[in-house]
């Protein structure tokens, strides 16, 4: 009787859309296959241009505001680290979860969610725009790495399990669905990735990435708000302030009641690490207290999910569709409270809203400029795609792909040039 332990991931999970030939540039006598398939996937994401562009894309405040702003790139690195830590506790492949964290925002356009809103308006005639669907499009076609037998790009040619791990919303756009994971143009690779998967259910690795994302941006947005003196954590201990936040949260998060949010605010305000921050004054002691707070909260939220999932699923490696991630409702409520703090004191600031309106106008202007002058106004890869497009919708999709690929600096230079201030894109 064999005692060999079964591999958690099989050949089906490691399959790529295009079979790749061995590398040919190695020196004689060297071993070129020392990495796992998922380690190669992680490296491909880490080295791709789309990831580097996130350094000049907004997380909450602009990437050039202050000395140490969080950008989409630094946020993605933090999500990858939190996800990797959770994967250790759950038995998922570490490279698989880490690459999901690295790639989870890789499709974000300039100005983050605000840019998503503008591009969704631009793309109304060709299926809309959604950052998660753009993630998938970048990884499966737009990012140049591997061609199929017809000379068409298959993007980074990641394994099935890797692409599935990045897919938070495994369905196309529908009438009642605000979030979706695939454009209609990308259904063929989507069907390949989701072959045999339970309908509308993300794999465990994607669920881990999703929770790591929630934890990262809820905790770190509050940290940035405290540093910028926009958020004072003492409001959590003030009954009237907490009640107002809970009322706002109830309207924003349908799954959590105002009473649950009030209780969550009370639990958070009672934590010694929260009380230690007090009125932040940027001294050494205050900076240490704030960093201790973020570390403790990330650990609190991640470890709660690990423990609850283990209690439900048992020991051993948990991978793919063997389990779902379980997060205690009280922990979800605490994370929601942190999100509400950022919403109330950062995102709802009138100056922030005015800036966002100007950003959306800029995206609309540049879209009109690119479409009117295409293919001349497009980068060579996008110009070729524009020429090959069969209808106006497909051509607009190419323009949207081009804008989504821009850094904020490049978008602003192009817009400034067309407005006539002498700068060039």
Swiss-Prot record:
InterPro entries in alphabetical order: dGTPase (IPR006261), dGTPase-like (IPR050135), dNTPase_2 (IPR023023), HD/PDEase_dom (IPR003607), HD_domain (IPR006674), PHydrolase_assoc_dom (IPR026875)
Keywords associated with the record: Hydrolase
Example of a GO biological process term: dGTP catabolic process
Bias (Basic and acidic residues) ranges: 11-20
Keyword Oxidoreductase on entry: no
UniProt GO molecular function: dGTPase activity
UniProt domain HD: residue ranges: 72-218
Pfam families, per the entry: HD, HD_assoc
Annotated stretches, region: Disordered: 1-35
Entry superkingdom: Bacteria
Record keyword Hydrolase present: yes
Disulfide bonds: none
PANTHER family with a match to the protein in the record: DEOXYGUANOSINETRIPHOSPHATE TRIPHOSPHOHYDROLASE, DEOXYNUCLEOSIDE TRIPHOSPHATE TRIPHOSPHOHYDROLASE
NCBIfam families reported for this sequence: dGTP_triPase (TIGR01353), PRK03007.1 (NF002829)
Membership in a protein family: Belongs to the dGTPase family. Type 2 subfamily.
Protein's name in the database: Deoxyguanosinetriphosphate triphosphohydrolase-like protein
Top-level taxonomy: Bacteria, Bacillati, Actinomycetota, Actinomycetes, Mycobacteriales
């Amino acid at each position: 009787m064999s005692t060999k332990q079964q591999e958690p991931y099989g050949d089906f999970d490691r399959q790529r859309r295009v079979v790749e030939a061995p590398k040919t540039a190695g020196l004689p006598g060297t071993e070129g296959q020392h990495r796992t398939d998922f380690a190669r996937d992680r490296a491909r994401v880490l080295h791709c241009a789309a990831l580097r562009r996130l350094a000049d894309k907004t997380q909450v405040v602009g990437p050039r505001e202050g000395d140490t702003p969080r950008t989409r790139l630094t946020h993605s690195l933090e999500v990858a680290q939190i996800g990797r830590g959770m994967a250790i506790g759950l038995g998922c492949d570490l490279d698989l979860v880490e690459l999901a964290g690295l790639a989870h925002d890789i499709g974000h356009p300039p100005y983050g969610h605000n840019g998503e809103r503008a591009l969704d308006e631009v793309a109304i005639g060709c299926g809309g725009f959604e950052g998660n669907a753009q993630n998938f499009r970048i990884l499966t076609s737009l990012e140049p790495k591997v061609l199929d037998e017809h000379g068409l790009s298959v993007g980074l040619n990641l394994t099935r399990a890797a692409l599935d791990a990045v897919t938070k919303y495994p369905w196309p756009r529908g009438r009642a669905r605000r979030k979706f994971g695939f454009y209609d143009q990308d259904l063929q690779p989507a069907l390949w990735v989701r072959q045999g998967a339970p309908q509308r259910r993300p794999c465990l690795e994607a669920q881990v990435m999703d929770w790591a994302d929630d934890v990262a941006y809820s905790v770190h947005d509050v940290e940035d708000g405290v540093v910028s003196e926009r958020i004072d954590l003492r409001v959590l201990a003030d009954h009237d302030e907490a009640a107002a936040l809970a009322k706002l949260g109830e309207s924003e998060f349908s799954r959590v009641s105002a009473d649950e949010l009030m209780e969550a605010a009370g639990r958070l305000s009672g934590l010694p690490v929260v009380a230690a921050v007090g009125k932040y004054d940027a001294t050494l002691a205050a900076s240490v207290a704030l960093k201790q707070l973020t570390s403790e909260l990330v650990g609190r939220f991640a470890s709660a999910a690990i423990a609850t999932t283990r209690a439900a699923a048992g020991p051993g490696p948990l991978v793919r569709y063997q389990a779902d991630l379980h997060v205690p409702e009280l922990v979800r409520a605490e994370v929601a409270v942190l999100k509400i703090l950022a919403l109330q004191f950062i995102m709802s600031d009138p100056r922030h809203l005015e800036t966002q309106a100007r950003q959306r106008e800029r995206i609309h202007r540049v879209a009109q400029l690119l479409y009117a002058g295409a293919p001349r106004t497009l980068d060579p890869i996008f110009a070729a795609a524009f020429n090959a497009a069969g209808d106006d919708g497909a051509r607009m999709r190419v323009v949207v792909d081009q804008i989504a690929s821009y850094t904020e600096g490049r978008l602003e230079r192009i817009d400034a040039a067309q407005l006539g201030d002498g700068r060039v894109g």
